Amino acid sequence: MEKITVLEKGQKLECSFEDLLKYHGVGYPGGVAHAFQVMQRAFPLLDDGKLLERREIELVTAFPGPGGRDAFEMVTRCVTDGQIHVDKDLPEAAGSPHGRYYFRFSYRGKTVVVTIRPGFVRQDFIEMARKPNRTEEEEVILAQMKRDMAKRLLDAKPEEVYDAMIL
């Protein structure tokens, strides 16, 4: 089972996708999966593969989803510490239901930008998620789409899903 490992005051903390999902709940598994994979993609690039002190990680993102926010919070405490900044108008990146899949992490003077590659987020999902006044049947379909996206993301390596650029 893959895990994200960070430090808190020098002590190792490990979080699996399942841990993050337990913290978040069942509402947005796709968002939790995005955050999990994005952190796996970005963190090794922020300090040459060394473990990061979690409370020193800052995130600027165009992705406002609650699944992602909860996953980032559990690993980095960025919500509690005011180290996450959501700006839906950030540079071009693939659209999400209510923002964009753009993540800019900073750590001790180094910055990495992570964006999703085409093909992992289906247009029918975005359309369904944005649809106002969904029926109960559509809510069931959307919930399945979220689970399917989480599986699609987790079945791939982070490098296959996301581009990363060191600034």
PLM feature spans:
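Non-transmembrane, aqueous-exposed alpha-helical and coiled segments at domain scale
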Residues: 1-28, 32-167
